[in-house]
């Protein structure tokens, strides 16, 4: 086993975005930029995106007494056609949150939209908080109108589909607002880079939700930095997703009418023009390259954030991928359908990372659609099965198996875990993600997953979705933001914008 590494608070928190993930320690109010919220004041938030995930996160925000939800926004007014984890899942959560066992009685399906968000906010502040002077929550259809009219906002929270995240975040930061968004910052690499650049220029307090408060991350860092399994050479990460449709080889041809109360133009945002179809909207947007990043972007940010901290990763130097294919019999012969519009039903992606200081080069392997790596012999020695989702560190002197994002880690086989002398706890354990961002809005340390810190993570994931379409090993120059061996793949780093929605990438 390697000799004990020197571990301290600064080595874990302080790092360059091009070499490792870390938090700056300079209070943000020293840097200037948007107005910072006094510790005695609430962070006044405009909440953009009230679909199912938006409603779930909205209820989390409302529980934080340090914030005030001033207004909500969504392109959909109110409908009962949203997918959910199981029947009445969201309705029951809302009932519990509002202490109202009859909320949603008579709904034909899962209900969400801006009017639902408004109703939840107003009911919570009046009934649960008992605010006698509460003036209500305004609901907007267009985020641009919200940013123009709501002069007293300190920040925005973005829970829209992925293709809108960067567009809204950049507009908000340029208006002097702090920003917190669901992952990813964007489904297009050039927009990830622009959002990080804008955050740095405006000094906005930013955060991307990516499970950035796991206590197992500093724990695993302490293990690996102390040589628990020697130099880590490989990491394997696998998920059972997608749960939504993928593998489509063409865009929908049907042109149903746009539902009443749904602004298709605003939902489409910067993406190329096309007729409305429900195959694009709500949770199923993730399967289309134009709107999402598939299971890699949906789940990968949760695990990759931990890996970047544990292994001090920066940008990869290469990426390659393999994917499931779709064939049909046409006129008595086999016909392969070339897929350029949606992510595959199953895929593997592989990135190569260079040496970082005294840490060896490492290859990161991703599997989705039920694919996973071979079962390690160390797990067979314990007569245990490979979990449906997981994270496996392969070192020169052993292996660590954990849950998908690093939870419940253990050295395998069990006898090696029992013999392992655990190092002392020397690294700080992170606070709640929303609390990290609130602290930054008040002029304190930036959140761990601020845009500058997650830029290389988000870019790595975007490179993975590009590799799925390129079908070859791609060489990546992060400094020049360029794929150096494939001009067509390099074009996929950029979005084809609708007129009037362009960003200066």
Describe each model-derived feature in a short phrase.
Residues 178, 185-261:
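A contiguous active-site-proximal alpha/beta segment in oxidoreductase catalytic domains
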Residues 44-48, 69-74, 139, 157-158, ...:
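Structural recognition of the beta-strand scaffold that forms the well-ordered cores
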Residues 13, 58, 118, 144-147, ...:
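Non-transmembrane alpha-helical segments in soluble domains
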Residues 79, 140-143, 159-165, 185-187, ...:
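Short, solvent-exposed turn/loop segments enriched in Gly/Ser/Thr/Pro and often Arg
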Residues 2-175, 193-206:
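N-terminal glycine-/serine-/threonine-rich beta1-alpha1-beta2 phosphate-ribose binding loop
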Residues 57-68, 75-78, 87-88, 98, ...:
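Ligand-binding pockets and gating/stacking loops
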Residues 14-38, 157, 342, 439-505:
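C-terminal helix-rich "cap/oligomerization" subdomain common to oxidoreductases
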């Amino acid at each position: 086993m390697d000799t004990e590494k020197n571990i301290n608070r600064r080595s874990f928190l302080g790092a360059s975005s091009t070499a490792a993930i870390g938090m700056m320690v300079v209070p943000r109010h020293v840097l200037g930029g948007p107005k910072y919220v006094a510790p005695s004041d609430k962070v006044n938030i405009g909440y953009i995106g009230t679909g199912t995930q938006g409603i779930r996160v909205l209820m989390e925000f409302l529980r934080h007494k340090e914030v005030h939800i001033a207004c909500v926004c969504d392109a959909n007014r109110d409908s009962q056609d949203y997918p959910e984890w199981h029947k009445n899942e969201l309705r029951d959560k809302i009932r519990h949150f509002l202490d109202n066992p009859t909320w949603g009685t008579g709904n034909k399906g899962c209900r969400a939209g801006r009017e639902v968000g408004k109703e939840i906010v107003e009911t919570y502040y009046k009934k649960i908080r008992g605010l006698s002077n509460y003036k209500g929550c305004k609901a907007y259809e267009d985020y641009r109108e919200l940013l123009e009219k709501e002069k007293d906002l300190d920040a925005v929270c973005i829970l829209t589909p992925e293709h809108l995240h960067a567009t809204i975040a950049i507009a908000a930061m340029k208006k002097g607002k702090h920003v917190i968004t669901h992952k990813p910052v964007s489904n297009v690499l050039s927009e990830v880079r622009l959002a990080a650049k804008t955050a740095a220029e405006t000094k906005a307090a930013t955060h991307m939700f990516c499970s950035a408060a796991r206590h197992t991350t500093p724990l695993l860092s302490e293990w690996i930095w102390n040589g628990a399994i020697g130099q880590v050479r490989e990491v394997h990460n696998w998920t059972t997703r997608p749960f939504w449709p993928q593998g489509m080889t063409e865009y929908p041809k049907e042109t149903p009418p746009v539902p009443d109360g749904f602004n298709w133009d605003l939902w489409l945002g910067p993406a190329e023009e096309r007729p409305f179809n429900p195959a694009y909207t709500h949770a199923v947007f993730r399967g289309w390259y134009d709107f999402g990043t598939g299971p890699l972007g949906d789940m990968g940010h949760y695990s990759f954030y931990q890996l970047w901290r544990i292994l001090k990763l920066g940008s990869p130097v290469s990426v390659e991928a393999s994917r499931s294919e779709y064939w049909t019999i046409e006129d008595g012969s086999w016909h392969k359908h070339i897929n350029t519009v949606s992510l595959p039903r199953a895929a593997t992606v592989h990135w190569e990372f260079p040496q970082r200081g005294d840490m060896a080069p490492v290859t990161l392997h991703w599997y989705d659609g039920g694919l996973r790596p071979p079962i390690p012999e160390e797990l067979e020695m314990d007569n245990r099965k490979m979990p449906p989702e997981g994270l496996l560190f392969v070192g020169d002197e052993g292996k660590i198996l954990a849950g998908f994002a690093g939870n419940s880690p253990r050295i395998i086989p069990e006898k090696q875990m029992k013999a392992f002398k655990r190092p002392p706890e020397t690294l700080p354990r992170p606070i709640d993600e929303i609390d990290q961002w609130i602290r930054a809005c008040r002029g304190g340390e930036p959140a761990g997953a601020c845009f500058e810190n997650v830029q290389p993570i988000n870019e790595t994931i975007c490179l993975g979705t590009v590799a799925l379409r390129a079908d070859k090993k791609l060489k990546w120059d992060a400094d020049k933001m360029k794929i150096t061996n494939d001009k067509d793949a390099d074009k996929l780093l950029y979005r084809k914008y609708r007129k009037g929605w362009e960003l200066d990438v």
